[in-house]
């Protein structure tokens, strides 16, 4: 039985090694084989063939980051809910209660953010 586990870890190790090695080799070969001829035109910002007329660095309001953070939180919630939903019949009532508590905590946080008017634009 130990041989099966060692073989599984070896396969994971090979995939990890290839996952790191292949992009590094491809990027290195691309850098070595491409022609290097820098020019002023190549270093300008390209906006659909039009010369840029102002600085591309624009400051975003902090509320955008709050919405992005909320999106990430609820996206991670989906990562937790999907495996639970797939294996629901094997996990039983205890896992159902745990997931309900998890979702309830997220909904309480969302209600708190809504009450504090974090989700309003103006």
UniProtKB/Swiss-Prot annotation:
It comes from the Bacteria. NCBIfam families: PRK07756.1. Signal peptide: none annotated. It is a multi-pass membrane protein. It catalyses: a quinone + NADH + 5 H(+)(in) = a quinol + NAD(+) + 4 H(+)(out). Its main location: membrane. PANTHER family: NADH-UBIQUINONE OXIDOREDUCTASE CHAIN 3. Pfam families: Oxidored_q4. Keywords: Cell membrane, Membrane, NAD, Quinone, Translocase, Transmembrane, Transmembrane helix, Transport. NDH-1 shuttles electrons from NADH, via FMN and iron-sulfur (Fe-S) centers, to quinones in the respiratory chain. The immediate electron acceptor for the enzyme in this species is believed to be a menaquinone. Couples the redox reaction to proton translocation (for every two electrons transferred, four hydrogen ions are translocated across the cytoplasmic membrane), and thus conserves the redox energy in a proton gradient. Its EC number is 7.1.1.-. It is found in: Cell membrane. This is NADH-quinone oxidoreductase subunit A. HAMAP family: NDH1_NuoA. The chain crosses the membrane at residues 10-30, 66-86, 91-111. It is an enzyme of class 7 (translocase). NDH-1 is composed of 14 different subunits. Subunits NuoA, H, J, K, L, M, N constitute the membrane sector of the complex. Gene3D superfamilies: NADH:ubiquinone/plastoquinone oxidoreductase, chain 3. GO terms for cellular component: NADH dehydrogenase complex; plasma membrane. GO terms for molecular function: NADH dehydrogenase (ubiquinone) activity; NADH:ubiquinone reductase (non-electrogenic) activity; quinone binding. Belongs to the complex I subunit 3 family. InterPro entries: NAD(P)H_OxRDtase_bac/plastid, NADH_UbQ/plastoQ_OxRdtase_su3, NDAH_ubi_oxred_su3_sf.
């Amino acid at each position: 039985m130990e041989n099966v586990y060692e073989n599984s870890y070896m396969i994971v190790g090979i995939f990890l090694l290839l996952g790191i090695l292949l992009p590094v080799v491809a990027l290195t070969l691309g850098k070595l084989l491409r022609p290097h001829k820098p020019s002023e035109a190549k270093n300008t910002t390209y906006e659909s063939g039009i010369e840029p007329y102002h600085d591309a660095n624009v400051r975003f309001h902090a509320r955008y980051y709050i919405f992005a953070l909320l999106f990430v939180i609820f996206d991670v919630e989906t990562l937790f809910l999907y495996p639970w939903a797939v294996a629901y019949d094997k996990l039983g009532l205890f896992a159902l209660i745990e997931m309900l508590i998890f979702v309830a905590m997220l909904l309480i946080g969302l209600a708190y953010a809504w009450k504090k008017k974090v989700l309003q634009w103006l």
